[in-house]
Each structure stands twice: as structure tokens, then as C-alpha cells.
Amino acid sequence: MEKSLRPFLESIADRVFPPDELGPGGCDIGAAEYVRRRLAGPRSADRLAVAALQDHLDASAREHWGAPFCDVGAPHQERLIEAILADDAQADVETVATLRLLIDMTVEGLFADPGHGGNRNEAGWRLLAGMAYPPRAR
């Protein structure tokens, strides 16, 4: 990879699962590291697609706000992501599919076995443990 995906993956992780008063965001939980490790393995096609997605989002952010995606702040990042997912950005099929894949991998990283780089200190599991579940039917 010519440029590091780390800041981009960290931005995406915190957009998928933002930090709030209940706990850490996706980046602090390790979701970005999980995705980085997955892309470093035998998934070179996915790594190239994610780099192309980063280029697309950087270009869009520069066009609208004069800075790359990682530097425009959460509200603008969310706006760009939502535009792609809603097809408002007129993105090609591969861009949409890559963003969806990246979101899926990020969610995996929130709850994966910590040995794979995500779910740091089992924070994702602890968040799930605090959730209320509906009663089971008998």
C-alpha cells in the first residue's frame, strides 16, 4: 500500500460505532485494527478496493470542504457515507459494495475474538452484556 489506511479505517470505525457516554467508539474498541489485519492477509483485492474507497471519499471531502475525509470531522464524514449508502452520491456499484463490506468488517471487529485485533479488552462483549434482551417465549 502506498499510503496508510490506518487513519481512514479509524475514521470509519468511529462513524460506524461512535464513542458516547455509554462507552468507547469503534476505534478505541479495536475495530479499525481488526479490519487492518484482515486487509493485510490474503484479501489483497479487498485492500485495493478499500484504498479506492478512501480515494473516492477523500476526493468528495476535498470537493465539499477542502480537506481529505479524515480531516473534515464526524458530521461531514457521516454525510458522505450516508450519501453513498443512499445512492445520493451517484457512486458506482463497487464503491457502494466496498463501503458495505467495510462496515460489515468493522462490526465484526467490535465483537470478534480479541485475539484477532478487535474487541479490545472485550469491550464489545461488555457492551452486549449490558443490553436488555426481550423475554424468551415459553
Describe each PLM feature range.
Residues 6-18, 22-26, 30-138:
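Mature-region segments of soluble proteins
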